[in-house]
Structure formats: structure tokens, C-alpha cells
Amino acid sequence: MNFEAGYHNGISGTLNSWGGEQHVISRLVEQIRKYKPKVIVTHDINGEYGHPTHRTVPYVVINAVKAAGDKSKYKSSCNEYGICKVKKLYLHMYSKHTVNMSAYSKSAKELDYKTPFSMACVGFDKHYSQHNGWSMHSKAVKKYPSYKYGLYYTRVGYDKKKNDFFENIKNS
């Protein structure tokens, strides 16, 4: 989606530097409608350590998830892709309807028997602009465990097992 990286002045400053709130939401609505995800997982509503971009992302995602299922919103992408009613939205560190993704440290066949955490480390290693003294093993990163989430929105009911983002979602 090619938005300017950097440390902006709060949510409104970030949105302004990205072309305005409606522009940003419309771009994400278009992607949701195009790819039709069943589940979306995003940043902590407080931006983990308060980073303005990290705070802006869940704000945009929450609004885009609502709009993507509404045919009266962003009609151009609706005409091209139809609507998409996302089934579940998880926020990192969200305190309600918590999910502990303990499988984060277990190898997964879908990842060539690597752990999701090891794959996150590979991704972080590519995110050069964020290194500046950070590592996936630092105390600061461990303060915001990457396996703790909360179910912010659901169309399919609340999780009972609380260990699978796709719980209650039938294959389709």
C-alpha cells in the first residue's frame, strides 16, 4: 500500500502523512475486499510501546473491517470485489476475550517445521529500520509478548479453546 514510514505525530499526524483518514481506510477496505480474509490480526491498540504508526494501524484496521462489509461504503472497491465480512479481528495485547497462542513456540508443518516465533525473527531481521538496539530477544520486546492477543470483533462466536485464531471458522 506504500505509505510513508517514519515516526509521525500521533494517529492524526500519521493519517495526514499517508493522505488522510478516508484515503487510508479506503485503501485497506479495498485490500480486505480483494483478498477476503476470514481472520485479521493486528497491532496493539496502544501501539505496543506507543509508536504512532503502530497505534494508527489498529485504528485503520478496525474501521476498515467494519466498512468492508458495508456495500454503501467505498463503492468503487465494492463494485470491483464485492463486500467482505471478516469473521474475526484480533488485536495484539487486547485484554478482552484473550487468546494465548502458545503454539507460537511449536514447529509447524506449514512453515517447513519452523516455529512461528523463528519466522517472526526472520521477518524482523528484514525490518532494518526498526533494529536500532532492538532484537526479538530483548527485554523490551518480551514486554509485549507476540503470542498474546484478544478477540476484538467476531461474527462467529467467542473462542473457547483460546489457542487458535481460526477457532469457530469452518473451512470454505
Feature-to-residue mapping (PLM):
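The feature marks non-catalytic terminal segments
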Residues: 67-172
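Active-site beta-strand->loop->alpha-helix modules in alpha/beta enzyme cores, enriched
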Residues: 1-74
